Amino acid sequence: MCDNKPMAPYAKLPELEEYKEWFKDFADLYREDGILQVTWKTNDGPMHHSGMSHRAISQLVRVLSLDFKNEIIIFTHIGDNWMIESDPNGWETYSELPTQRFQHQYFDDTNLIKNMVFDLDVPTIGAVPGPGFHWDSAFLSDVTICTEDTVMEVPHAQGGLVPGDAMGLMCQHYFGTKRGNYYMMTTRQFTAQDMLDHGMVSEVVPKGKAVERAWEIARMWKLMSYENRTIMSN
């Protein structure tokens, strides 16, 4: 006798309470009415740039894309700045040649950009609370809000690295090739007004208001149909 049931159930999707624990050292996750706020950090303080944070960002973004309860995502950073420090002991495995370094640079670093662009099929907002660097996740979002004191830079050249990751590509895209190259090759900072004038950010708001404004926009999107806002973000 046939009971008309499928032979196997759907594969389990990740649940918020599960991956909150997985990524607790790198992000605070809060969800309300389908709007997820991702607050980057390291332990209980500002996120420190490291191989570990690189991997956490790319992996978390991929996991978020698998949880259909995340209908809108806001990316922000703990405190009044974006990432402003580097972990002095956070890059040791990058020197382990050849396999470890390749895995870091190809799977972790490249996927940090790729996952933001291709994995997230829902509207995203970057809410930048102040100055910093490594601003990829905020500026790869559909809408980016920053505070009026925000200044950013592409610091690689100063650290002995050739610039050209997502920050470099976005500089060339928004500022133009020549001016983008100038910012990359001199590590000169660009201001909130520079970014607004060139379409790199959507709005500039007073200090302390970036996250609040991001939630206002997210709640406005929630008034649209799920299908409309989801397809619109792609």
Kindly give the residue locations of the regions a language model identified:
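C-terminal long alpha-helix characteristic of the crotonase
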Residues: 145-150, 201-234
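Glycine- (often His-adjacent) and acidic-residue-rich active-site loop
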Residues: 69, 77-109
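Alpha-helical segments flanking ligand/cofactor-binding loops in enzyme cores
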Residues: 115, 135-136, 169, 181, ...
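Hydrophobic, secondary-structure "cap" segments at the distal end of domains
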Residues: 168-178
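Terminal peptide-recognition signature
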Residues: 38, 56-57, 75, 123, ...
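Conserved CoA-thioester-binding segment of acyl-CoA-metabolizing enzymes
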Residues: 2-76
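Well-ordered beta-strand positions
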Residues: 137, 142-145, 182, 186-188, ...
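Glycine-rich beta-to-alpha active-site loop
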Residues: 109-159
